[in-house]
């Protein structure tokens, strides 16, 4: 391996480390530099696009995935990411076209079947969604995500027997996938299923749970203890779940700061003393009303 290829490979490793750390702006910046050196390296388009997705910059994500498809129109990963981006902005028609395009190329593309099934679920097309999940499971019956999504859908339509089966199957495949525990905690009768409580208590002792799985486990235990009448333990686990989830939330307020700065700058240029009312309204005062969503409060000046 020559020095150029070695440098490129090392830079990719660094970028992936930044990606895994959630430093998406750095990922985008460094990936674009590499892309200028090798515009045909398709994984870079995916890395940049997914980072933009995580930042909710969906238009930019669509653009980068589309540019990648101009380089390789048969890249299923690129087209899947493009479809998921359209789905994220509720452009279900374009998302569906891209899912169908992938499945025309490869009818057994499991991730496309899964995500297409999720889209149908979003549209409340239950039978279509279940059909796509079943197609995916015939190809990969050991995919815990498909089992969980199917369980979640079945639970929503009241088919608890099958929902419990698939939630349990999800945990058999990946016992640390605690959203399945949370789902089970809403359906099981704990007079008959004390095994699940013990399983979750033991799981809580593990050191390798992700933050996401840890707070889901606390939520599940909170549900269970509420069901069996142990209010103090229920409250304890719900509080812990909320504390963990709150710490895990990473929200960049820079966009909001810039928006408010622009609003303030715009208002600085206004001379309110020069504002004129219509002649028949001279007896009225100007009022400003500020509504604060979800606060239950409105300020009137």
List each language-model region with its residue ranges.
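Alpha-helical solenoid repeat scaffolds of the TPR/TPR-like class and their adjacent stem/linker regions
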Residues: 1-301
């Amino acid at each position: 391996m020559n020095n150029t290829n070695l440098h490129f490979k090392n830079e990719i490793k660094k970028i992936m480390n930044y990606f895994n750390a959630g430093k998406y702006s750095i990922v985008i910046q460094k990936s674009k530099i590499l892309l200028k050196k090798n515009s045909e390296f398709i994984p870079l388009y995916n890395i940049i696009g997914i980072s933009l997705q995580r930042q909710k910059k969906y238009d930019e994500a669509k653009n980068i995935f589309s540019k990648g498809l101009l380089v390789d129109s048969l890249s299923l990963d690129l087209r899947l990411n493009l479809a998921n981006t359209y789905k994220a902005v509720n452009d279900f028609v374009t998302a569906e076209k891209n899912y169908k395009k992938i499945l025309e190329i490869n009818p057994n593309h499991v991730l496309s079947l899964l995500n297409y099934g999720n889209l149908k679920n979003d549209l409340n097309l239950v039978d279509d969604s279940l059909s796509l999940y079943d197609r995916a499971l015939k190809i990969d019956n050991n995919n815990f995500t498909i089992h969980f999504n199917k369980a979640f859908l079945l639970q929503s339509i009241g088919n608890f027997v099958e929902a419990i089966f698939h939630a349990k199957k999800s945990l058999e495949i990946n016992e640390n996938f605690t959203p399945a525990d949370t789902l089970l905690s809403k359906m099981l009768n704990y007079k008959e299923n004390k095994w699940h409580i013990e399983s979750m208590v033991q799981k809580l002792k593990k050191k390798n749970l992700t933050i996401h799985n840890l707070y889901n486990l606390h939520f599940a235990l909170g549900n269970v203890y509420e069901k069996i009448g142990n209010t103090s333990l229920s409250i304890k686990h719900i509080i812990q779940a909320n504390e963990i989830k709150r710490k895990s939330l990473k929200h960049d307020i820079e966009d909001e700061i810039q928006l408010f700065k622009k609003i303030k700058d715009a208002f600085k240029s206004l001379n309110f003393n020069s504002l004129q009312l219509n002649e028949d309204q001279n007896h009225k005062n100007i009022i400003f009303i500020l509504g604060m969503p979800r606060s239950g409060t409105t300020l009137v000046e």
